[in-house]
From Swiss-Prot:
Physiological role: Involved in the cell growth and proliferation. Catalyzes the irreversible transfer of a propylamine group from the amino donor S-adenosylmethioninamine (decarboxy-AdoMet) to putrescine (1,4-diaminobutane) to yield spermidine. Spermidine cannot be used as an aminopropyl acceptor.
GO cellular component, one term: cytosol
Species of the source: Helicobacter pylori (strain ATCC 700392 / 26695) (Campylobacter pylori)
InterPro entries per record: PABS (IPR030374), SAM-dependent_MTases_sf (IPR029063), Spermi_synthase (IPR001045), Spermidine_synt_N (IPR035246), Spermidine_synt_N_sf (IPR037163)
Residues involved in S-methyl-5'-thioadenosine binding: 29
Designated gene of the protein: speE
List of residues binding spermidine: 83
Protein name, UniProt field: Polyamine aminopropyltransferase
Compartments where found: Cytoplasm
Length: 262
């Protein structure tokens, strides 16, 4: 048996699996979890794959990309995703997290897949809301959008940022789908003073890219090394990974030169 990951519309990967462990379907999402000899458990969420053995890569990168460039991290918002491991990493900063996800059926089905599921859900500083309107009106130090946002989503979320707040969003991989990344940078750059693409260095099982955006905060100039050195129980993230995440090959520097704002 095998499952197929669509990297781009023209590129696919196949993974051998041993068994299907779970199949859950809701109105808007489909979650399947498989057992794999080489990769442990693999979750397929709407055709996108998550590897249980490597969940820490994305969660550490995103959490500390934001956390180590901000002096204070009191309020964090996570929207359009299910990644509770991201919240687990963010709790290293003693912050409050608002997590917006309407699909409780799918979220609760990750109970055995996310290693820190119960720890996060039971944390007194974690608030799960079905929609943004259910939350108290406030400004955030850090906002994560775990699906690529359109211009209207960007406009709505940027109004919820503090003046020096950071907005981190998922995008297409700049090497695999540079036109899509270019368009995403245009959307972000039309709103923010800083808009820079990055990827997870040495992560070979992903087709994701990301964008770091802010009105005032810069992901490299404002990086605080003492905060990185103070982190405990991290397996992937360090200062070298942080800086390397923003490195681009020369051809992509040319492609994005009019879209990157730094």
């Amino acid at each position: 048996m095998w499952i197929t990951q669509e990297i781009t519309p023209y590129l696919r990967k196949e993974y051998t699996i041993e068994a299907k462990l779970l199949d859950v379907r809701s109105e808007h999402n489909i979650l399947e979890i498989f057992k794999s000899k080489d990769f442990g458990e693999i979750a397929m969420l709407n055709r996108q794959l998550l590897f249980k053995n490597f969940l820490h890569i994305e969660s550490e990168l995103l959490a500390h990309m934001g956390g180590c460039t901000k002096k204070e991290l009191k309020e964090v918002l996570i929207v359009d995703g299910f990644d509770l491991e991201l919240a687990h990493q963010l709790f290293k900063y003693d912050t409050h997290i608002d997590f917006v996800q309407a699909d409780e059926k799918i979220l609760d089905s990750f109970i055995s897949f996310f290693p820190h599921f119960h720890e996060v859900k039971n944390n007194k500083n974690f608030t799960h809301a079905k929609q943004l309107l259910d939350l108290d009106i406030k400004k955030y130090d850090l906002i994560f959008c775990l699906q690529e946002p359109d211009i209207h989503r960007i406009d709505g979320l940027k109004r919820m940022l503090k003046e020096d707040g950071v907005f981190i969003s998922v995008a297409k991989h700049p090497l695999l789908e540079h036109v899509s990344m270019q368009n995403a940078l245009k959307n972000m750059g039309g709103v923010f003073s800083v808009a820079m693409p990055f990827v997870a260095p040495l992560r070979i099982l992903s087709n994701k890219g990301y964008i770091y955006a802010s009105f005032k905060t810069h992901p490299l100039k404002d990086l605080m090394t003492p905060k990185i050195e103070a982190l405990t129980s991290v397996r992937y993230y360090n200062e070298d990974i942080h800086r390397a995440a923003f490195a681009l090959p020369k051809n992509l520097q040319e492609v994005f030169k009019d879209n990157i704002k730094s």
